[in-house]
From Swiss-Prot:
Protein name per Swiss-Prot or TrEMBL: Cobyric acid synthase
Keywords from the UniProt entry: Cobalamin biosynthesis, Glutamine amidotransferase
A Pfam family matched in the record: CbiA
Gene Ontology terms describing biological process: cobalamin biosynthetic process
UniProt entry tagged with the keyword Magnesium: no
Protein's gene: cobQ
Natural source organism: Gloeothece citriformis (strain PCC 7424)
Cysteine disulfide partners in this protein: none
Chain's role: Catalyzes amidations at positions B, D, E, and G on adenosylcobyrinic A,C-diamide. NH(2) groups are provided by glutamine, and one molecule of ATP is hydrogenolyzed for each amidation.
Length: 495
């Protein structure tokens, strides 16, 4: 099987960005391409049509390659839960949870078997696999249990690219140090170096690039300039690089929970020209935005506890009582209820925790995870709009004790499936389980128009395409940027 591997000198060097770009570039050139990341640690995930869970970044890469996401593209997904533990997703299904110290003993062998098996299946269907590493391939203390960097490259005999982030400083030292720490047979696979996130005059790098090529014997294939393209973030650290649009007509705050997950839900909102989207730490003042969103969480109870102890829960209550709009998605939806129950102590030792008491619901955390794609129709803010998305949650939400039906407590079903979400009659508090909600263009605009009407602003057109079409334009822009600044000929000639 022909293969290209992308590894980085550090985390956030640009591996996902470059892998995605290569998928789109080579797909446009006629290759039948698949992305692959053997092991990913991330809280942004996606559900395949068969109900398997995988990293959202690999789903984006699949779309870039013009193919459907499938769990073989990311056979191991680690979802941090706090307290140095992670949930292990193996071939799309929950396999258990583990600590960093126990992971190697428990999952190294089955993990590698899953990786090798997934690659074998993909080899039957695709011309080329473009693999992404994780972190650095030269972490000496972790190398013996590294499942996703040079072990994969050696298994495939992959033509390997080393990408470095020059914006953080020390790029030349990062490259030289990484290469020095690789084994000779690993280093021999590195066929090109790519410098990423460069700001400034390109010619100023020329002398450094010549020295680097002479010293390492490896060509620098390109310098990718810093870009403001809104590329889907892989983990919450990427949120610090996001810039809030100033002077938006509509201001929306997203609570940056300690264990925030699936914040790719808000890329579509961030793409709206009239919206200023701000990620708010728990220590910051809530202010008086047009809406506040409580996003998904990997551990609902721990993040709910953080809302209470930080004082943010009280601020949210005051904001809602003053007529503010609050929307919760997935874990955020669960937090809006009266209480969260954990009888099996899945998230911790506390079996019951008080919610924000903004919706008449309660949630019970259960061992089995629900992962499924959904197609429904909206009741609010406009009825009859088709809405697609996906569920990823460990818990069942129902009406609170003593509540017989929604109408009795001033609420309505948000969709034609009541279990997916509810909204108060006042339309001040919204909650739903549907990830990808804002990707639905007509629904997103209808909700924004509801906010705009409250501000006395004119309505925006609702007859717009879904965000997946905007994502396609983004993927083409990413590919165009890389194609214009990286010489791929030496790499492709070796395939």
């Amino acid at each position: 099987m022909k293969a290209i591997m992308v590894v980085g000198t550090t985390s956030h060097a640009g591996k996902s960005f470059l892998t995605t770009a290569l998928c789109r570039i080579l797909a446009r050139r006629g290759w039948h391409v698949t992305p692959f990341k053997g092991q990913n640690m991330a809280l942004n995930s996606y559900v395949t049509p068969t109900g398997g869970e995988m990293g959202f970044a690999q789903a984006v890469q699949a779309w870039a390659a013009g193919t459907a996401p499938r769990v073989e593209m990311n056979p191991i997904l680690l979802k941090p839960q706090g307290n140095m533990t992670s949930q292990v997703i193996l071939m799309g299904k929950v396999a258990g949870q583990t600590t960093a110290s126990d992971y190697y003993e428990q999952y190294f062998k089955p993990g590698w078997e899953a990786i090798a098996s997934a690659l074998k299946r993909l080899a039957f269907e695709y011309d080329l696999v473009i693999c992404e590493g994780a972190g650095s391939p030269a972490e000496i203390n972790l190398k013996h249990r590294d499942l996703t960097n040079m072990r994969v490259a050696q298994h495939l005999g992959a033509t390997t690219l080393l990408v470095v982030d020059i914006d953080r400083g020390g790029a030349f030292a990062h490259v030289v140090g990484t290469l020095a720490l690789l084994d000779p047979e690993e280093r021999a696979l590195i066929k090109g170096i790519i410098i990423n996130k460069f700001r400034g005059q390109r010619s100023l790098l020329d002398s450094g690039i010549k020295w680097l090529e002479d010293y390492t014997g490896i060509p620098v294939l390109g310098v990718i300039p810093w870009s403001e393209i809104l590329f889907p973030a892989e983990d919450s650290l990427d949120l610090f690089e996001r810039k809030t649009k100033p002077n938006g007509e509509i201001n929306i705050n997203v609570i940056r929970l300690p264990r925030i997950s699936n914040f790719t839900d808000f890329d579509a909102l961030e793409s709206e020209p009239t919206v200023s989207l701000n990620y708010l730490d728990l220590s910051q003042e809530l202010g008086y935005p047009d809406a506040v969103i409580i996003p998904g969480s990997k551990t609902t109870i721990q993040d709910l506890s953080a809302l209470h102890t930080s004082g943010m829960a009280e601020k949210l209550e005051q904001y809602a009582n003053a007529g503010g709009i609050v929307l919760g998605i997935c874990g955020g939806f669960q937090m809006l209820g009266r209480r969260v129950l954990d009888p099996n102590q899945i998230e911790g030792k506390q079996e019951e925790f008080a919610g924000l008491n903004l919706l008449p619901i309660e949630t019970t955390i259960l061992p089995d995870k629900i992962t499924t794609q959904r197609q429904v129709f909206s009741n609010h803010p406009q009825s009859g709009l088709p809405v697609t998305g996906y569920e990823i949650h460990q818990g069942i939400t129902r009406l609170a004790d003593g509540v017989k039906n929604l109408e009795n407590v001033g609420c309505q079903a948000l969709f034609n499936d009541e279990k997916l979400g509810i909204v108060t009659h006042s339309q001040l508090v919204w909650g739903c389980y549907l990830h990808g909600l804002f990707d639905n263009g007509a629904w997103r605009r209808a909700w924004l128009n509801f906010l705009r009407h409250r501000r006395g602003l004119s309505a925006l057109p609702t007859g717009i395409p879904n965000y997946r079409e905007q994502r396609e334009a983004t993927l083409n822009s990413v590919a165009d940027l890389v194609e214009a600044n990286v010489n791929l000929s030496p790499i492709l000639s070796q395939l």
